[in-house]
Amino acid sequence: QSNFMGGNPSVENSDDQRLLRLRFPAGVRSNWHTHTDGQLLMLEEGLGLTQVRGEAIYEMHPGEPWWTGSGVEHWHGADPTEASLQLTIYSGSVEWLDPVTDEQYMGRATRR
């Protein structure tokens, strides 16, 4: 008996998929970086922040997905006053870039 109706889906390109749960204490963030195949972030707990270079900081709330395309420079982490638990899914490689400065990190956050 199948668990699907109308046919069965196929699994594609799953060998290099990475799924991580990252717990960021308040005030902790990544460096700027890119992913060769993009990155899907989902906040599980707390308040998270993310930013594409040159754009406004975006506040992440639990249950909201955030997609970064291939080669897009970005960072993500916790709010300065609240920790966060982030689920990240990506494949390919990560290129680590320069640190996010305090001035960049403390910039005005907006909700998309």
Language-model segments: residues:
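Short, conserved beta-strand element in jelly-roll/cupin
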Residues: R23-P25, T34-T50, I89-G92
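A short hydrophobic beta-strand segment most commonly corresponding to one strand
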Residues: W67, E82-P99
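Conserved short histidine dyad/triad with adjacent acidic residue
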Residues: R18-H35, S70
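Short acidic-glycine-tyrosine-enriched beta hairpin
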Residues: G54-G71
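Ligand-binding pocket scaffold of soluble enzyme catalytic domains
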Residues: V28, T50, S84
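A short, N-terminal "cap"/entry segment at the start of jelly-roll beta-barrel domains
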Residues: Q1-R18, N31, E95-R112
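Short beta-strand His + acidic residue motifs that chelate non-heme Fe in jelly-roll/DSBH
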Residues: W32, T50-Q51, T68, E73-P80
